[in-house]
């Protein structure tokens, strides 16, 4: 009965993940409650089925993106940590010293963290920014529409591969910007600094199967699958 429920509610991919977890123990809890102390012992589970974001992000893209690209970053990050002074260090502290840690930790640690964060802010059915976040958006950008335009432009104009971000800056304002490759706003080398609240992956592997070279179409589709409940929670935690 439980198997039937899983299939009906979440799809076959979720059943596979549940079975994989039970048999191997290699996938951990999908809540990702502590981003600054991500586990290097277990690869985090995707928090929904591969087809959960259809039609905006297709199931095949999600499968390849999560199980190949993201998993490779995790494995390579764990391997790069071994035997270094950073081996038992929380990932946020590694990022704070990433200029000294080297490219292997920068690229793979960034790829691991950024994807976990990306999965958690995606989802369907949330209502939108909370009153508190809406007020902060209005203060920093003038309106939600202006914020959305700024964020979308950061994503569309990032040359080559990278990420666009909404962050809470150290002075408690909201800011939008982008980072190259697998850099993120927690890294000491990033011009954009702050606590991440929202992101979009603009590497071609994130959208090419469905959108080909039309990154702008992918960015516009992204707004249909923002998990505002999680973004609101992140904002509440960040302003404490």
Residues of each region from the PLM?
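Feature for soluble, non-membrane regions of globular proteins
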Residues: 26-240
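Bacterial Sec-dependent N-terminal signal peptides
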Residues: 1-28
């Amino acid at each position: 009965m439980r198997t039937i429920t899983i299939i009906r509610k979440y799809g076959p991919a979720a059943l596979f993940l549940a079975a994989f977890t039970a048999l191997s123990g290699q996938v951990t809890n999908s809540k990702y409650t502590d981003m600054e102390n991500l586990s290097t012992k277990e690869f985090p589970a995707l928090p929904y089925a591969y087809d959960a974001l259809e039609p905006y992000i297709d199931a095949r893209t999600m499968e390849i993106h999560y199980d190949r690209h993201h998993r490779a970053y995790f494995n390579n990050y764990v391997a790069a940590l071994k035997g270094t002074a950073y081996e038992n260090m929380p990932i946020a502290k590694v990022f704070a010293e990433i200029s000294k840690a080297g490219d292997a930790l920068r690229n793979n640690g960034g790829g691991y963290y950024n994807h976990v964060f990306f999965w958690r802010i995606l989802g369907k059915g949330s209502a939108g920014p909370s009153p508190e976040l809406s007020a902060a958006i209005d203060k920093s950008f003038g309106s939600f529409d202006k914020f959305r335009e700024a964020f979308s432009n950061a994503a569309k104009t990032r040359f080559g591969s990278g990420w666009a971000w909404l962050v809470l800056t150290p002075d408690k304002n909201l800011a939008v910007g982008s980072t190259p490759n697998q850099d993120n706003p927690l890294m000491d080398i990033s011009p954009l600094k702050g606590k991440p609240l929202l992101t979009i992956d603009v590497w071609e592997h994130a959208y090419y199967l469905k959108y080909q070279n039309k990154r702008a179409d992918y960015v516009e589709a992204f707004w249909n699958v923002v998990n505002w409940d999680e973004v609101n929670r992140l904002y509440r935690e960040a302003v404490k």
